[in-house]
Amino acid sequence: MAAILARKSLSALRSRQLVLAGQAWQQGANTSNGTLLGTRTFATNDSFSTDKDDEEREQLAKELSKDWNSVFEQQINTLFLTEMVRGLMLTLKYFFEKKVTINYPFEKGPLSPRFRGEQPLRRYPTGEERCIACKLCEAICPAQAITIEAEAREDGSRRTTRYDIDMTKCIYCGFCQEACPVDAIVEGPNFEFATETHEELLYDKEKLLENGDRWETEIAENLRSESLYR
């Protein structure tokens, strides 16, 4: 790289010198012709270099100096590995600063009360199922992930005999929670439910009720905190 820059600089300087030599020779020839013809000439500023020539020389000198400075700086960086040292210093700086990550899964960040995760089916405090088999959640689900079957009980109330959710279809839009008149189906706080098989993601009623029993305290608190905005 240094050799290329030096070669270019010398070529530019040689070209400039040839141009100046040609101009000087032309001026000398004109002066000789004027003397032979008896024309009296006097030395003026035009016989020497003009301001434009001086500016061009200064500009050329600056460019040469700039090129050599860049070559020198590059050689210094290569010799003393300054760029590597600069990178190591940056690493050392962040080594002692406060960490921006957490040690997942042993540490977990906070979740919003509006977080939409794995769904549960809730119960009343008495243990009775909340779901009344109105099928509004099944009707509003855009992914058609919910399947409900129901029958009437002896007391005349309706309860589900089948409540399935295909978690591979669910898009966690929360429409089922908004449509439910009794807060039976909600979006839960759990996001860690990866499985090894597809069948494990086909949730039945027992699985959903089990989720509801596990997270009831947290779900009730989230619904209470968000009740002002519903």
UniProtKB/Swiss-Prot annotation:
UniProt binding sites for [4Fe-4S] cluster 2: C141, C170, C173, C176
Enzyme Commission no: 7.1.1.2
Residues annotated as binding [4Fe-4S] cluster 1: C131, C134, C137, C180
One MF annotation (Gene Ontology) recorded for this entry: 4 iron, 4 sulfur cluster binding
GO BP term, example: mitochondrial respiratory chain complex I assembly
Function, in words: Core subunit of the mitochondrial membrane respiratory chain NADH dehydrogenase (Complex I) that is believed to belong to the minimal assembly required for catalysis. Complex I functions in the transfer of electrons from NADH to the respiratory chain. The immediate electron acceptor for the enzyme is believed to be ubiquinone. May donate electrons to ubiquinone.
PANTHER family for this protein: NADH DEHYDROGENASE [UBIQUINONE] IRON-SULFUR PROTEIN 8, MITOCHONDRIAL (PTHR10849:SF20), NADH DEHYDROGENASE UBIQUINONE IRON-SULFUR PROTEIN 8, MITOCHONDRIAL (PTHR10849)
Protein name from the UniProt record: NADH dehydrogenase [ubiquinone] iron-sulfur protein 8, mitochondrial
Annotated organism of origin: Nicotiana tabacum (Common tobacco)
Taxonomic path: Eukaryota, Viridiplantae, Streptophyta, Embryophyta, Tracheophyta
